[in-house]
Swiss-Prot record:
It comes from Methanococcus maripaludis (strain C5 / ATCC BAA-1333). SUPFAM superfamilies: Ribosomal protein L14. The keyword RNA-binding applies. CDD domains: Ribosomal_uL14 (cd00337). Binds to 23S rRNA. Forms part of two intersubunit bridges in the 70S ribosome. This is Large ribosomal subunit protein uL14.
Length: 132
């Protein structure tokens, strides 16, 4: 796992619903924890593009539902600033389900993947068709 080069806005707190952008059988995910989050008192843990989060599968196949799994956020609606000054935002909030080491469980990723997530997680970038 590599460090992030951009200033990522942590806009997805606990309870946020994400679209599952892979073919594992999950359709909708809910963030329940953010890995390595260190916050202040009374602040909800939040993640952004490129962060690993733990999610609960809310909609999907009966085998996938109600499971708690690690996932990587690949898109977010809230714009964030890159090191070169450009601002990036996507149409939806999306994540892919991964193993604890960071390799994707699915065999394809639907839609674009942010450049920050692709650089940080090589397994995700291998499956990405569009890196934006």
């Amino acid at each position: 796992m590599k460090g992030l080069g951009s200033t990522i806005v942590r806009s997805l707190p606990n309870g946020a619903r994400l679209v599952c952008a892979d073919n594992t059988g999950a359709k909708e995910l809910e963030v329940i924890a953010v890995k390595n989050y260190v916050g202040t008192v009374r602040r909800l843990p939040a993640g952004g593009v490129g962060h690993m989060v733990f999610v609960s599968v809310k909609k999907g196949t009966p085998e996938m539902r109600k499971q708690v799994l690690p996932a990587i956020i690949i898109r977010q609606k809230k714009e964030y600033k890159r090191a070169d000054g450009t601002r990036v935002k996507f149409e939806d909030n999306a994540a892919v389900i991964v193993t604890p080491e960071g390799t994707p469980k699915g065999s394809e990723i639907k839609g674009p993947v942010s450049k920050e997530a692709a650089e940080r997680w090589p397994g995700v970038s291998r499956l990405a068709k569009i890196i934006h």
